[in-house]
């Protein structure tokens, strides 16, 4: 079949309207980064979530951030903190109180995603958690986070994990 000339790529054509805009996954990644920082602040300073959210929205450019996802994480994690911490404890050989606060924030965020956002594949949850730990955590913190999330996934996403091992 001969292609019509109009189907050919022309480098002089203007870019599509959405060219250069971050993808949904990129916006979510940025939301997770800010949420990790906000959860760390919540854990350390015990300020109200609304105060923290307002501060983050003033202090950060949310143009390339999924603001709704940021809010969902920031308010969602504390809402089920006891459930999250109960799920994490059997996967670690260290008490939650002894954990680095940054790694704790990452683990809580990732556990929340396992529990509440089943639309996000478990492998994505693990990968995003590891990446957050690389950015914000201690030198080898990402290895610890990876190990914990790897142990946690089968208990919170059993069917999905089994289906992916076939």
From Swiss-Prot:
Swiss-Prot/TrEMBL keywords: RNA-binding, Transcription, Transcription antitermination, Transcription regulation
Gene Ontology CC annotations of this record: cytosol
Tagged with keyword Transcription regulation: yes
KW DNA-binding (keyword) present: no
BP terms from Gene Ontology: DNA-templated transcription termination; transcription antitermination
Gene3D superfamilies in UniProt: NusB-like
Signal peptide residues on this chain, from the entry's feature table: none
Pfam families: NusB
Span list, region Disordered: 1-28
Record InterPro entries: NusB-like_sf, NusB_fam, NusB_RsmB_TIM44
Molecular function GO terms recorded: RNA binding
Comp. bias intervals (Basic and acidic residues): 1-18
Function as written in the Swiss-Prot or TrEMBL entry: Involved in transcription antitermination. Required for transcription of ribosomal RNA (rRNA) genes. Binds specifically to the boxA antiterminator sequence of the ribosomal RNA (rrn) operons.
Matching PANTHER family: ANTITERMINATION NUSB DOMAIN-CONTAINING PROTEIN, N UTILIZATION SUBSTANCE PROTEIN B-RELATED
Family: Belongs to the NusB family.
Protein name, as recorded: Transcription antitermination protein NusB
Organism per entry: Pseudomonas putida (strain W619)
Gene coding for it: nusB
